[in-house]
Amino acid sequence: MKKISQVLNWLSSLKIAILLLLLIAISCAAGTLIPQQESNQFYYDNFNKNPFLGIINANILLLFEFDHVYTSFWFLFLLIWLGLALSVCSFRRQLPILKSALNWIDYKSPRQIAKLSVAQTIVTNNCSESLEKIKLNLKKQGWNVKETDGRIAARQGVIGRLGPILIHLGMILLMIGATYGSLNGKTIEKFLAPGRSIDLLNNNEEKGLTIELQKFQIERDPQGRAEQYKSIVNVIEPNGSNESKEISVNYPLRYKGLTLYQADWSLAAITIQIDNSPKLQIPIEPISELGEQVWGTVIPTNKDGKNQILLTVDSELGPVNIYDNDGTLLTKLSINKEEKVKGALINIINIIPSSGLLLKHDPGVPLVYLSFAIILIGGSLSIISTKKIWVLHENEKSMIYIGGLSNRNLSGLSKELPNLISFLEN
């Protein structure tokens, strides 16, 4: 039993809790700095040439699961250890402190009062009357008062002892919610052009919600830079009912546990007409060699497919740059403008943007929100000082002894006692 007690004392020590919090904070920082959930090849390409912190290459990174820090075995172990430490601390330290604060202690001798942190002695002509005044004054100031055989015990702020317990409970719930969300949550990133949709599966791998992009709009500043982008999406239930919602950057849609973010934008296709052909919707792809936000495609201008040109564009507003196969810029075509290019009449009908949507389903979010609320309440309660006052009298000496304790702000309590004395003197 002695060894078990020693282990529990070590486990619930403040030093261990601080060390665990420090390790978890460092782990979260690593998870922020290192891209998560990428392919193994991504880490080999990026971290073998430039190791993280100069020493952690791709092999070490993958071995210790830094590619998915928040679901790694060692990170979950740290969370479980911290949760266990907080639980043991609450049961072995905080609950007994709360229980002690709720118990009434009956001090019967002046010597006990004199040993308290704050103590005063009052000479009075009428002890019974003075005790009654003190009792009424304490009640008036919000103290909980108990009188036993002419002895007064009073306490205030006992609820403050509940604060640390609530903080521990909130932190445990926070870790449970975050872990549950990491293990069971889902994240989907998808670019959709207007009219396209994505089907989501429920927990039984059956078709659930359908997210359809109805309209996508990019707002640009006078220099042509994207300032805001908005999507109007239809959320379609399996039974066919649907709701139309608008989302934009910093204004996501929350729907039955699903959060839909407006995360990015792109260009999906160019609608073009060559000579007398029907309107052709040609997909375009990013061309990183030409710039960070440049999309393009190669098309032939005649039926044999040999006379090719490169179309590039960096905005849904145009223009479309047309290059020869040797890289020479032939022309720039605006939307709904047509021009002869290498013997073919080319007309740009429109440029179709696509909306970058980020879908997140995190079942741990309600528990995380609840935990934050509990932590805030616990933190607020922890500020409250728990104060206790005892009052005794000796009729033979016409003396009243008053003393008190406080877990914090002892100077505040030492100022209250003179006020009580002043009240009696008046």
UniProtKB/Swiss-Prot annotation:
The chain crosses the membrane at residues 14-34, 72-92, 162-182. It is found in: Cellular thylakoid membrane. It holds the Pfam family ResB. GO terms for biological process: cytochrome complex assembly. Coiled coil: none annotated. It comes from the Bacteria. One of its GO terms (cellular component) is plasma membrane-derived thylakoid membrane. The keyword Thylakoid applies. May interact with CcsA. This is Cytochrome c biogenesis protein CcsB. It comes from Prochlorococcus marinus (strain NATL1A). The lineage of its organism: Bacteria, Bacillati, Cyanobacteriota, Cyanophyceae, Synechococcales.
